[in-house]
A protein has these predicted regions:
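Bacterial N-terminal signal peptides that target proteins for export
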Residues: 1-12
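Acidic, polar-rich low-complexity tracts and alpha-helical solenoid repeat scaffolds
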Residues: 17-206
Length: 206
């Protein structure tokens, strides 16, 4: 009888935990889905203004991430939600908000998350007109990070900045280095690698 009572007490707790887990995983999954769809639309129109549909999806990404942060602050996906939200804010030109969120990762994130946060902070500074600071930070990340995907992102952004500054040799150098890092990173199948590869192809055929 005692065991039955214990079982009856445990079942509601287990169900509640399962529902809680499903809720925040589902919310974050939807945030990722909106972000990936926004990125797909943006990359299809590369070189032009970001389409309204993509901007709308980036906005929905931010909304979903905020739900994760406010309703599930103890979940293991909090850092991922902060990073995803900051990336969406970058594409919506909300650079100060993105930088503010990325600073949270510096003290709470893993080494990989910190490197990614540093990357997005650097490109936010570039878009804010702090080009030299962005150049220095991107180069520092390349030196300090062991992550080939992060290094590829840095090189491709350095290529974009070099192109903007009219530095043809630097543009080609960083494009080639970005391609090398992507080749190393091909072992990791991810949406990030796919989008970076597409970005590289478009820059190389400009």
């Amino acid at each position: 009888m005692y065991r039955i009572c214990r079982l009856v007490c445990i079942i509601p707790i287990t169900v509640s935990l399962l529902l809680f887990s499903c809720a925040y995983f589902n919310t974050f999954y939807n945030a990722e889905r909106y972000y990936e769809e926004a990125d797909r639309i943006r990359l299809e129109k590369s070189g032009k203004a970001i389409p309204l549909k993509a901007m709308d999806n980036y906005g929905k990404t931010i909304q979903k991430c905020r739900v994760v942060l406010s309703e599930f602050p103890e979940s293991k996906l909090v850092n991922d939600a902060i990073l995803l939200m900051a990336k969406a804010q970058f594409y919506r030109s909300e650079y100060d908000d993105a930088i503010g969120n990325l600073k949270i990762i510096y003290s709470k994130g893993s080494a990989k998350q910190i490197a990614e946060a540093q990357y997005w902070s650097a490109v936010c500074k570039w878009k804010k007109g702090k080009t030299q600071a962005a150049l220095d930070e991107l180069k520092d990340i390349i030196k300090s990070s062991d992550d080939s995907v992060i290094k590829a992102q840095c090189h491709l952004s350095l290529a974009d900045i070099s192109d903007e500054l009219g530095r043809a040799e630097d543009f080609l150098f960083h494009l080639e280095e970005g391609a090398k890092q992507l080749k190393i990173g091909q072992k990791e199948e991810s949406f990030t690698i796919s989008s970076l590869t597409l970005h590289l192809i478009m820059r190389a055929t400009r």
